[in-house]
Amino acid sequence: MFCFLGLRLLKYITFRTAYATIFAFLLALIFGPFIISRLKKLKLDQILRKDGPKRHLSEKMGIPTMGGVLIFFCVLVSLFFWIHFFNIYFLIVLFVMVSFACLGFTDDLLKIKRKNSDGLNPKFKIYGQILFSFISVVMLYYFGGEHVSILYFPFFKSLKLDLGILYIPFGMFVLISASNSFNLTDGLDGLAIGLSIVVIGALIIIAYLTSRVDFALYLNIPNVKGCEELVIFLGALLGGSFGFLWFNAYPAKIMMGDTGSLSIGAVLGMVALILKSEILFAILAGVFVVETLSVIIQVVVYKKTKKRVFKMAPLHHHFEELGWSEMQVVIRFWIIGLIFAILALSTIKIR
């Protein structure tokens, strides 16, 4: 790591974050074409839902999947140079990223092998998510700081709730929900990664404020000692995500796959847990929450009445069926995601 060079600039979180971001972005631009060509040669193409929008079957055939590999490669290489590895919060987030990426990779691989969109057995998939989330939340519970089991509520200065040992199942719920909601949203070129970039950017701000005693006291938010390394991690993830978006923007040359979406969702959920922003995260990731609710509502109502609330779920497909172009859906969802992020950040001061 560059820290051994003793350069004064490397003591500054902002400097390391900026260069971790730039480094990961440039790595994605450099290695992106190579990884895309390798995935094509290996015939690791995206398997499309047969019950999805019909035009997707012709437009998106033959596009390689497992794009999460590109993101995480760039993130890890960048972090090698810019982060202090032996930080407990970074190690927990790293475990979440790798474990959920492996689960998603297995799911993607089985879809390709079987040539259908079923992938990993849903029971095994949820068991894997439960196992990995349990391990990571237990690690956080026992090695985290003094605030670890306390929930802080936006808008209220002194409203707190100490969950005690119940924080473990609560944390597992946050991780699994975040992982699956990001996965459900990954249905259009640039949609999930663009919304993820908005969430990552907001979490960078929250992580920086939370890491500083002075800002934490002024804003009446918990000061989480040691979380400054998460700012650098999120910076690298932001750079890698921007680099991936370069190739995933319409018309996409690569898809994120479950390798990316399951892992990014879980990672951001874990970061929210560490930063004591669990409730805030629900606002921040508002588009992902709405997308998930649209699927739940569609399934529940259809089972009871045999009628559909939406033309198609998740919600982004509903708007496609209404005649919106893919780019219209994506850009409008990005705008709404940005509004949710601004709303979430504004609550930090309104207490």
Swiss-Prot record:
Cell compartment(s), UniProt: Cell inner membrane
Cofactor: Mg(2+)
A Pfam family annotated for this UniProt entry: Glycos_transf_4
KW Cell membrane (keyword) present: yes
PROSITE patterns hit by this protein: MRAY_1, MRAY_2
EC numbers: 2.7.8.13
A GO molecular-function annotation: phospho-N-acetylmuramoyl-pentapeptide-transferase activity
Ranges that cross the membrane: 17-37, 61-83, 88-105, 130-150, 158-178, 190-210, 230-250, 254-274, 279-299, 328-348
Membrane topology: Multi-pass membrane protein
Pathway membership: Cell wall biogenesis; peptidoglycan biosynthesis
A cellular-component GO term for this protein: plasma membrane
Function noted in UniProt: Catalyzes the initial step of the lipid cycle reactions in the biosynthesis of the cell wall peptidoglycan: transfers peptidoglycan precursor phospho-MurNAc-pentapeptide from UDP-MurNAc-pentapeptide onto the lipid carrier undecaprenyl phosphate, yielding undecaprenyl-pyrophosphoryl-MurNAc-pentapeptide, known as lipid I.
Family named by the database record: Belongs to the glycosyltransferase 4 family. MraY subfamily.
Protein name: Phospho-N-acetylmuramoyl-pentapeptide-transferase
Organism listed in the record: Borrelia duttonii (strain Ly)
